[in-house]
């Protein structure tokens, strides 16, 4: 399927949020937000706020809408800070890049985020019945897969997001499904250690995986949301704009064709040990996952839906970045919220061709 045949497109709207010049918590940018709705229907942004030294917190800001379009935000403070030991390293700390999925079956907002602690980036889970008070369920643990000979718990993991409704896993068990992106290179946390991908993995580049949590386990113990099993690859990098790695964006949404997943694709050179890369380019891609078997890709755009073309997307802490992380319906339209050059937050409209 070519990009012109792919049934969805993104149309750039503009910049939604910039760092406040005198706000120390935003000294190194606002970026990569989640979104959440309050009980009375108000829409909130949960931006990643980056202080000096690349220390990140998760903020809260109400989104202001004019004529059906998000145009501004009103800041309301911080909802999550790196306060746990596993969110802090000797020379680093952070809670980063949140994704939030409202799961009606649980009546909860489920947040995945990156805990940047002593072992590098690890995925963690938190839950909330509103937009302000988040209960940590802790870092994710991965059931060991002896067939692949891999313990995913050994590896850095980012870009995790829950599906909004249960699906049946490959064994037919009704489960909550999660997309995530493990990386096999351990040099950032163990210099000199070579990459050790799972046995038989045909492509070692960071790719999109899926894991599952049985619904009945969560009904017995909410903390099971952080215990994942049944891991398998969904998609590898394929096209020129994503030759280095790919990672999930907002929670997938149900469309006529299946599950629509927006994601980011990266091309360029990654320098080991560098948190804020300077020689890469991030773009927004899209694929359709099967409605019943979401580990199967039905179709995929062969070109990016949005690339770093404006000054706000090209110039920043990490240049040349479009990083979609949230998707919301406002009136008759859907809007995508994305990080711009690791410095600002932009908005694009999701259009049906």
Model-derived features: where do they sit?
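Electrostatic interaction modules used in gene-expression and signaling proteins
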Residues: 327-329
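Beta-rich carbohydrate-recognition and catalytic domains
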Residues: 1-28, 32, 36-93, 102-160, ...
């Amino acid at each position: 399927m070519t990009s012109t045949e792919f049934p969805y497109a993104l149309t750039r709207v503009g910049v939604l949020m910039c760092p406040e010049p005198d706000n120390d918590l935003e000294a190194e940018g606002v970026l990569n937000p989640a979104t959440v709705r309050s009980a009375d229907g108000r829409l909130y942004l949960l931006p990643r706020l980056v202080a000096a030294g690349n220390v990140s917190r998760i903020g809260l800001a109400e989104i202001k809408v004019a004529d059906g379009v998000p145009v501004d935000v009103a800041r309301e403070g911080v909802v999550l800070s790196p306060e746990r030991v596993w969110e802090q390293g000797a020379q680093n700390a952070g809670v980063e890049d949140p994704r939030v999925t409202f799961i009606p079956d649980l009546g909860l907002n489920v947040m995945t985020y990156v805990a940047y602690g002593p072992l590098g980036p690890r995925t963690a889970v938190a839950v909330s019945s509103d937009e302000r008070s988040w209960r940590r369920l802790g870092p994710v643990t991965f059931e060991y897969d002896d067939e692949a000979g891999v313990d995913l718990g050994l590896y850095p993991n980012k870009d995790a997001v829950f599906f909004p409704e249960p699906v049946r896993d490959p064994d037919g068990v009704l489960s909550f499904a999660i997309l995530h992106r493990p990386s096999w290179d351990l040099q950032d946390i163990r210099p000199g250690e070579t990459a050790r991908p799972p046995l038989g993995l045909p492509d070692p580049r960071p790719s999109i995986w899926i894991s599952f949590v049985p619904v009945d386990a969560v009904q017995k113990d909410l903390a099971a949301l952080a215990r994942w099993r049944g891991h398998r690859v969904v998609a590898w990098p394929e096209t020129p704009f994503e030759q280095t790695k790919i990672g999930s964006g907002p929670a997938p949404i149900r469309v006529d064709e299946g599950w629509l997943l927006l994601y980011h694709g990266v091309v360029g050179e990654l320098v080991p040990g560098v948190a804020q890369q300077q020689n890469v380019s991030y773009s927004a891609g899209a694929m359709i996952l099967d409605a019943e078997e979401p580990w199967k890709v039905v179709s995929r755009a062969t070109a990016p839906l949005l690339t770093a073309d404006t000054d706000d997307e090209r110039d920043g802490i990490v240049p040349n970045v479009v990083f979609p992380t949230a998707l919301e319906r406002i009136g008759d339209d859907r809007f995508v919220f994305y990080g711009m050059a690791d410095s600002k937050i932009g908005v694009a409209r999701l259009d049906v061709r």
